[in-house]
Amino acid sequence: MNRILSVSFYLFFLYLYIYKTYGKVKNTDQEISNIYGTNYYLRNGFLNGKNGKGNKYEDLQEEGEGENDDEEHSNSEESDNDEENEIIVGQDEAPKSDEAEALKSDEAEALKSDEAEARKSDEAEALKSDEAEARKSDEAEALKSDEAEALKSDEAEARKSDEAEALKSDEAEALKSDEAEARKSDEAEARKSDEAEARKSDEAEARKSDEAEALKSDEAEARKSDEAEARKSDEAEALKSDEAEARKSDEAEARKSEAGTEGPKGTGGPGSEAGTEGPKGTGGPGSGGEHSHNKKKSKKSIMNMLILM
């Protein structure tokens, strides 16, 4: 936007400079008549032209260009000029007087001075315009230079910003990669730790299970041993009891046998009382058979105990 405005201002002032310098023709007849009045032509012999032909004064009167004469000269000067006009128009009349020559010379000097002043003024205006144009051109160049510097600075800043962004992006990527690696390493360590813990737990469980199984087996063995001991003890008690029973039975049988042997003696006697005691003797052998049965039972129990051992 600044560049467009600077170019627009530059073109505008260039147009003004061209218009002031070349847009109007200096020192035309109309401008001279407007500045100095119609008498300028009369005093300088422009009425009939350089070759004495033409009627410039009448043309200016028709166009109304002689009105500025009232502003620059008094009425007395107009009357003198009218007399001079009559003298100039009448080319065939008497020669001009010295007074008219001196007046013409003064007017010519004044005209030259005015022309010099006008030229100086135009030159000053042109110089000012040139200086203004040069200053504007310098300002435009400075503005362009400043814009170029600003553009370079902006580009440098943008490049630095892009480099900083790229560096930040690279650092962020590297940080993410490092974090990912660290996370993977932590996960691997955690997984290894979990696996080790699980393995330890499994081993502990297996050991506990084995110990429990061994304990159960030991308890079972101990229970079996206790049962065997108890059974042995029971069998020993039973054997002792059987032996005691057998011994008691043997003693009883022995007593019965001793009592039974006396029976036949009774039969041999004549007394009835002795004869009646005979049948009791027959009961002795029966009890002896029961004793043999008890002996068989004790033998079986001993055999069973030996088998269990």
UniProtKB/Swiss-Prot annotation:
Region (2 X 15 AA tandem repeats of S-E-A-G-T-E-G-P-K-G-T-G-G-P-G) location: 257-286
Protein name: S-antigen protein
Gene Ontology cellular component annotations, sorted alphabetically: symbiont-containing vacuole
Pfam family, one: S-antigen
Positions of the UniProt region annotated as Disordered: 52-309
Biased composition (Gly residues): 263-289
Protein location: Parasitophorous vacuole
Region (20 X 8 AA approximate tandem repeats of A-[RL]-K-S-D-E-A-E): 97-256
Biased composition (Acidic residues): 60-86
Biased composition (Basic and acidic residues): 93-259
